[in-house]
């Protein structure tokens, strides 16, 4: 899914559209679909489209905002993704790692407003960290700072989507949570989500969190396990 918003120079949210259906894939068709969704959203805005000065695309994985290259998704062209999208959309386009963008948003207007040094942990389907040092977002030499989830931390033989085995993300992320839930259910444990698993319905993190709010013992135990794994590595 996609979330799209428009903000002004003060950081005020002018308009938004949340939970837009989108199938994320490393294909030209998926990229064209992304551009189409953005163009459709722009047409619905009450403001003059000429006032749009920049479109910033936040995506997961390895992103170098300075060069405009994405190395994890939409990386099939031998030129910057920002340049490709600029041609498709007709606006200036920049790209940024999604976790770093969240970090900066929290820094400007969120719970850490006013702090100078921040570590922001984003646990979603994957796992990432955003870093602010002396009030400035830290990207690292190559623009990849914060790829915490791909530190090899376990001898578990679980293949990560990055191609390596044993990444922290394989034991402490949303995808790890869903995988472990399905494994334990297959071994005979019961959850409020068991029927959905057997029917092969896709599960989301929201489903698991909703189950914990209904005192689902297995989901509570899994979230505690994920939290312990994550906490140990952040502290270490």
Spans of model-derived segments:
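ATP-binding/phosphotransfer module of carbohydrate and carboxylate kinases, centering on a glycine-rich
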Residues: 1-51, 89, 155-159, 164-236
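Short, acidic Gly/Pro/Ser/Thr-rich loop/turn segments
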Residues: 2, 62-64, 128
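Short, acidic, Ser/Thr-enriched surface-loop or helix-capping motifs
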Residues: 8, 65, 132
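Glycine-rich phosphate-binding loop and adjoining helix at the ATP-binding site
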Residues: 14-117
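Short beta->alpha linker loops
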Residues: 97-99, 143, 225
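Glycine-rich phosphate-binding loop of actin/hexokinase-like ATP-binding domains
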Residues: 114-172
